[in-house]
Design a protein with these regions (language model features):
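Conserved phosphate/ATP/ADP-binding segment of small-molecule kinases
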Residues: 121-203
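Short pre-catalytic strand/loop immediately N-terminal to key active-site residues, enriched for Gly-Thr
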Residues: 11-17, 203-217
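Charged C-terminal helix
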Residues: 56, 238-285
């Protein structure tokens, strides 16, 4: 019998386009050699253009799904995506609290790439107060970081630097914060990892990536799942963040456009590259 690969449990909503959501998590985790388990938090109506509606599942269903699989399978990490409701946030906080030694990676999704709202003030407060204190890493984009850092002081959002936001988020209890810069007006995309340096919270490293043309559906899900997968394989946080960004950038470089909306990251780009090389080799012989 083969050895069991690292197992990751993702809590996320569905996406019929497989660009984002639980389907994207499963693909990214599998591509990096993990075995994905999933708890469905909601059903969405969406395509590659945007999200039309979200139906959160009842919190009891979330609890039943998670408790049942966790009684059977040991997990190496938790990954959280779109949670759907305050009640779901609360029950998931209770679930992960029973596994304090398992890394908890949170992608705090507040809106779709098109700008469709997927959260509200009550959900944001619940995440900040119930989940972030338990988190190993949270991965907001710059817009989400500003909203979450000042969820109870909305007037401060527009006046704050991203570093100030990161420090406030670290103060909520997360061990690390990574703010992605795709929404910022910069030539390169700058992603910034924050955490404790010699006991003092602050910037650990800025990562600069070429800004690719186009708009992508599910890049955040891909990145956070990739970091989670790397941590499940035993990498340190800095190693995991670097490797996951490299993987995600490649998925975006190889992205395709199956519909009329955004591009979809190709989480199995390496498999198709291998196929091309193999076919080219066959032609040469």
């Amino acid at each position: 019998m083969a050895n069991t690969p690292p197992t990751v449990l993702t809590f996320a909503a569905t996406d019929p386009s497989t660009g984002a959501g639980v389907q994207a998590d499963i693909m990214a985790l599998s591509s990096i050699g993990c075995y994905p388990l999933s708890v469905i938090t909601g059903i969405t109506v969406q395509d590659t253009v945007g999200v039309e509606s979200v139906m959160p599942l009842d919190a009891d269903w979330i609890n039943e799904q998670a408790r049942t699989i966790l009684e059977d399978v040991s997990v190496s990490a938790f990954k959280l995506g779109l949670l759907g409701s305050v009640e779901n946030v609360a029950v998931i906080a209770e679930i992960v609290a029973d596994y304090p030694d398992v890394p908890l990676i949170i992608d705090p999704i507040l809106a779709s790439g098109r700008g469709d709202e997927l959260s509200n003030e009550e959900m944001q407060a619940a995440m900040c107060e119930l989940l972030f204190p338990q988190a190993t890493l949270i991965t907001p984009n710059s817009l989400e970081a500003r909203r979450l850092a000042y969820y109870d002081e909305s007037d401060e959002v527009k006046h704050s630097s991203l570093e100030e936001c990161a420090l406030r988020l670290l103060g909520m209890g997360s061990e690390y914060v990574m703010i992605t810069g795709t929404h910022e007006r910069s030539n390169d995309v700058v992603n910034s990892l924050y955490g404790l340096q010699n006991g003092t919270p602050g910037l650990i490293k800025d990562y600069h990536w070429e800004r690719l043309p186009g708009s992508y559906h599910g890049s955040g899900c891909t990145l956070t799942s990739a970091i989670t997968a790397c941590l499940a394989h035993g990498l340190t946080m800095e190693e995991a963040v670097h490797e996951a960004q490299e993987f995600t950038w490649q998925t975006l470089r190889h992205a395709f456009r199956p519909g009329m909306g955004q591009f979809i990251p190709d989480r199995f780009f390496w498999a198709r590259e291998s196929d091309v090389q193999e076919k080219a080799s066959e032609l040469q012989h």
